[in-house]
Amino acid sequence: MSTTLNENLLLAIPLAPLAGSLIAGLFGNAVGRKGAHRITILGVMIAFLLSAKVFFDVMGGASFNATVYEWMNVGSLKLEVGFLVDSLTAMMMVVVTFVSLMVHVYTIGYMAEEDGYQRFFSYISLFTFSMLMLVMSNNFLQLFFGWEAVGLVSYLLIGFYFTRESAIYANMKAFLVNRVGDFGFLLGIGLLLAFAGSMNYGEVFAKRAELASLHFPGTDWGLLTVACICLFIGAMGKSAQFPLHVWLPDSMEGPTPISALIHAATMVTAGIFMVSRMSPLFELSDTALSFITVIGAITALFMGFLGIVQNDIKRVVAYSTLSQLGYMTVALGVSAYPVAVFHLMTHAFFKALLFLGAGSVIMGMHHDQDMRNMGGLRKYMPITWITSLVGSLALIGTPFFSGFYSKDSIIDAVKLSHLPGSGFAYFAVVASVFVTALYSFRMYFLVFHGEERFRKPKHPESPMGMAATHGHDDHGHGHGHDDHAHEPHETPWVVWVPLVLLAIPSVIIGAIAISPMLFGDFFQHGVAFDKVIFIGENHPALAEMAEEFHGWVGMGLHSVSGLPVWLALAGVVVAWFLYLKRPELPASIRRAFGPIYTLLDNKYYMDKINEVVFARGSVAIGRGLWKEGDVVVIDGLVNGSARFIGWFAGVIRFLQSGYIYHYAFAMIIGMLGLLTLFVTLGGK
């Protein structure tokens, strides 16, 4: 029997981290450093515990879909704050609050000696509040508020080291690129509002058939297709899909804890969640789905290639995020929304683990992020080593780890799809399995195995070996850390405990969740629509997968007969051979394939293209408008009018000679002119 969740309990979930954020931010000096982290952790812990309760209540049949605050009415349009809590929302709430809680605890150790300690805790709690408001919304207005709020807070966090020029450039880049996506997102919302007459999900979904029948006058463009593509452009910005991906690697300029929160559970997952929530609309447009599939495939494969040439440990993990987001997007495109959400969940745990593990390595290495200066750390950082190995195994899709179940399910769904673009997508996601394993275990072997390179002089191109600091996490610099050549060391318990707690779901959550989420009734009983996630009968991939599914054990055992597991193994073996067995080979390969390496090292020149075409292009257009539009036209009208009046006044002044006969002559000429005019007109 369906029951309604308690409204006050739901309100407490986003308000608890908001309260912690406000106290730490506005009264940071009064509460002190300990007070700031205690009050924000308490707020997020309350949100997590209440989210867990809501999750179990929803599993028992409870739900909620109602307005909690009416802001204003504009004609027949209602602007409201409301919550829609179903299985999708409840799962997202648990993931967001749990990962956020781990990041909050981890931050105590990682940011221990930073001057902006209270400010940072305030920001990450505000980030949690923003994401909760986004996933809990039941209308497009609140969705857009949460959407913009996570963008704003990410701007503040990426630019946390605001005295560093590279950080300011990175947060401005993230802000501007996301504005491009948000413009498309706003257009999509505007189209739905204009033709559906409502911002409430349920009311818009109820008119989906009517919307699908509409076309723009004089074109074959379906209204719903255009609206869905516009909505997805918003997702391309938030979830960093090609070509709006360029901001995400530069977000590494922020402290490592926020990198984990952005990449694992908040901002970049917002686009995936939004498209899944809008499945009743997207299912009516194969054109939009094909567009999504191709964009996701490009991102999954080509962003993975960039991870191979990175030397900054955080940037390797960042490019893995881009690639995995591509996987999720491909799943959305082939109508496997539950699989996309499933991978979103498993990815949140192992990606947070990998980022926080990278931060632990950075702390143990006295703030060095260059993997060329590491090696052999497993002896010095055993907990970080084991947990990072767990995260890497989950990332590459090792059988029985969580990432295996979600990633292989995506590959199977793409294989069974018949949408245009699915053939290319299948090639991309399969090839990306090898690429993912290669860059993941390149990182793992360079950091934890092999020669102890930290005993040698720093690599001349690394941030620690030269004056340039681009991409370097300045955590703790100048705040009392002992930066001289000590051996690496394991980090404090407050840092490694979150790693252990994240490692557990990175192993087991896939096996636990695959059956109910993909082949059970987890997404069946909807509130705003018939089903939480709707899949049309013309997209049967998931239904066909269900026929072949024989439990999580059977799936793991059966994987040895499939291509992906062997590609992953091949990637690991190649990484071992190149970076442990024959470490001199990568330099030779780089010289042999110089142009390709240069292309990858310059990130396909996307930053250069954006700078030349958009940045300089905008400046050139602005300069042209200023010179031709402002100076010539506008100033010409204003100054030209003044000059004309001056000239005319000069002419008039010439006529004012002061001689009476001049005036008499003018009067006579005038009278003759008037008489001539009257006679002429009278004759007609």
Q: PLM features: residue spans?
A:
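Transmembrane helix-loop-helix hairpins at membrane boundaries of multipass inner-membrane proteins
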Residues: 1-9, 27-122, 195-219, 225, ...
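Aromatic-capped, Gly/Pro-kinked transmembrane alpha-helices
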Residues: 61, 76, 81, 493, ...
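Membrane-helix interface motif
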Residues: 59-65, 193-204, 398-410, 511-541
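Hydrophobic alpha-helical membrane-insertion segments
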Residues: 43-58, 181-194, 388-396, 498-522, ...
